[in-house]
Amino acid sequence: MNSIIKHLAIATKLLNQPVAEEALAANVARDRNLNANIQSLSEVLRSYGFENHISRRKLVEIPSLAMPVIIILHNDEAAVVSEVKGRGEERVYVIRQGDAPAHEVSHKDLEAQYLGFCWFIKPKLTADHRSEL
């Protein structure tokens, strides 16, 4: 779960509205084993001004316009997909994992690690009421 929190923080930074990993971790509810609750984490993101939802879908079904998106990987790992190049099974994904620099991964390689869940996140749009026009 810590990997997911870290990658949600990276995604907020890519959206130019950074929320520190520590802030997310501190505000999320935990169970008896101190594991973070996914629903609580979603609510914390909403409180920071982000619309978000988890979706079960195939890797090729993730829209390239929805970037950045957090993908859930095997072994309690996660990654942020910041860009998608190509189409179908010829796709190449630009991913960020932890503190490593962004790198490209083929569809075949990423699909072998992908659990089938992705977390979409974007800033909430709010009306600007500063002008009378």
Predicted regions and their residues:
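Cysteine-nucleophile protease catalytic domains, especially the papain-like/related folds used
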Residues: 1-54
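Noncatalytic regulatory segments and standalone regulatory/sensor domains
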Residues: 1-10, 29-36, 62-133
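Glycine-rich, N-terminal phosphate-binding loop and its surrounding beta-alpha-beta segment
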Residues: 48-51, 59, 73-75
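An acidic, carboxylate-rich microenvironment
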Residues: 23, 40, 60-61, 109
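A short, surface-exposed loop/turn module that caps and links secondary-structure elements
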Residues: 53-65
